[in-house]
């Protein structure tokens, strides 16, 4: 990773716009705030990550699952009090490793002084055109991003209207930037030095955007098959099955059965190999879906 975190290129700016559209659709007001939280452990139960509002369980639950896997399989003589920030960081790196296509693309925040004017929201592409690579006008390059303690000090000096937690969706998205890394060791070092990004008010969203950027928006769209609905439900705020599958397996397929199924000539994609983390759902009991053996019998057996 380069020491200087460069400003967004036109291509990266378009990638972030496409990610926003794929996640939220045309309207993220209201739902956005439900997803605005960091990763934190419960005071009452040391092994549990806290979920503040309905919705972000599609990200928090997979991180929780990988946390437990690390504890049960990789920590001899474990205690649930061993689930600390370093293991949370390892769990997040495990998820990103599954999603990597060519390199790791970590989405982080610029400070207020570094934010250049953005093009109007009307320039955001429609979900149906997510594969298009139409260039958009790029503003002048902002200064390099500041992370870690330096970033925290800068944010503390800004007005309350610019503090994290008071941003509307547009203010949040105009502060995003992407850092490219080649190895998972670089990613882990970055999060070690900037754990405040994950624990801060937008930690869950920053991981979610990093997962999608690392996977690549075109790859996500190809695996989903259907992008007529956003990955986050516009009314209830929960994540789609495709998003959950991406977090657990690295593939954004929309179904939980084994392999692909042909339904009336339409190929519907499912899980194509044994998963490290199992998945079950009450929807199967109600006969809305069938969970295949790749999810039902996970690669790692606990107990």
Task: Show where each model-derived region lies.
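Cysteine-dependent deubiquitinase/ubiquitin-like isopeptidase catalytic cores across multiple families
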Residues: 2-53, 59, 64-66, 70-148, ...
């Amino acid at each position: 990773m380069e020491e200087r975190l460069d400003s967004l290129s036109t291509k990266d700016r378009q990638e972030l716009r496409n990610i926003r559209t794929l996640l939220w659709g045309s309207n993220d007001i209201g739902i956005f705030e439900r997803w605005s939280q960091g990763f934190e452990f419960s005071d009452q139960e040391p092994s549990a990550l806290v979920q503040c509002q309905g919705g972000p369980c599609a990200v928090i639950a997979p991180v929780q699952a990988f946390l437990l896997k690390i504890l049960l399989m990789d920590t001899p003589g474990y205690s649930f009090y061993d689930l600390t920030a370093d293991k949370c960081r390892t769990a997040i790196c495990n998820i990103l490793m599954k999603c990597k296509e060519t390199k790791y693309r970590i989405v982080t925040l610029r400070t207020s002084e570094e934010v250049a004017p953005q093009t109007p929201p009307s320039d955001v592409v429609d979900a149906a055109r997510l594969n298009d690579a139409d260039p958009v006008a790029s503003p002048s390059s902002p200064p390099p991003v500041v992370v870690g303690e330096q970033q925290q000090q800068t944010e503390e000096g800004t007005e309350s209207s610019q503090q994290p937690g008071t941003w509307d969706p547009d203010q949040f998205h105009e502060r995003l930037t992407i850092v490219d890394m080649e190895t998972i060791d670089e990613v882990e070092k970055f999060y070690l030095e900037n754990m405040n990004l994950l624990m801060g008010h937008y930690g869950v969203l920053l991981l979610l955007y990093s997962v999608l950027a690392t996977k690549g928006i075109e790859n996500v769209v190809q695996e989903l098959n259907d992008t007529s609905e956003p990955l986050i439900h516009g009314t209830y705020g929960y994540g789609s099955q495709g998003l959950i599958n991406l977090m657990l397996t690295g593939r954004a397929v929309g179904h939980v059965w084994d392999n692909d199924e042909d339904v009336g000539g339409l190929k519907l994609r499912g899980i194509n190999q044994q998963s490290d983390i199992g998945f079950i759902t009450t929807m199967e009991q109600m006969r809305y879906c069938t969970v295949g053996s790749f999810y039902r019998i996970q690669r790692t057996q606990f107990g």
